[in-house]
Amino acid sequence: MPVTVRVRRVGHRGPPLDLPRYESAGAAGLDLRADEPFTLAPGERRVVPTGLALELPPGHEGQVRPRSGLAARHGVGMVNAPGTIDADYRGEVGVILVNHGQAPVAFARGDRIAQLVIAPVVRAELELVDALSDSDRGAGGFGSTGQ
């Protein structure tokens, strides 16, 4: 069932960009666009403004995820993937990009730089205990289940 996300344009860096949209009928993410032109040098990271602030419905979050095409073609990804937008955050959405490639990558204002997935949030209640129940895996981590 669709939820309503309220969107406000912020920053005023030029003519209004299109609002994020799903690019196909089965797409999980709305494409976010850069609100200013920039060049990302090899090894450089940058917070890229989107020109948008969101009001997410209670009980939901926004997950900012990298675009696979940028990673495959240019080695550009996100430092914190996914980035989390909390329902009570009202500031401008920024995307932290990093260039893992060997060459600078230029972006124009309006280029798609990330995806925004809206997801429900389950809040946990923590219970402090003296011991945890046993499991087949136990404390094994970092490759302990095989290759």
UniProtKB/Swiss-Prot annotation:
It holds the Pfam family dUTPase. InterPro entries: dUTPase, dUTPase-like, dUTPase-like_sf, dUTPase_trimeric. It catalyses: dUTP + H2O = dUMP + diphosphate + H(+). The keyword Hydrolase applies. GO terms for molecular function: dUTP diphosphatase activity; magnesium ion binding. It comes from the Bacteria. The keyword Hydrolase applies. Substrate binds at R67, S68, G69, N80, T84, I85, D86. Its EC number is 3.6.1.23. Belongs to the dUTPase family. HAMAP family: dUTPase_bact (MF_00116). This is Deoxyuridine 5'-triphosphate nucleotidohydrolase. It comes from Anaeromyxobacter sp. (strain K). The lineage of its organism: Bacteria, Pseudomonadati, Myxococcota, Myxococcia, Myxococcales.
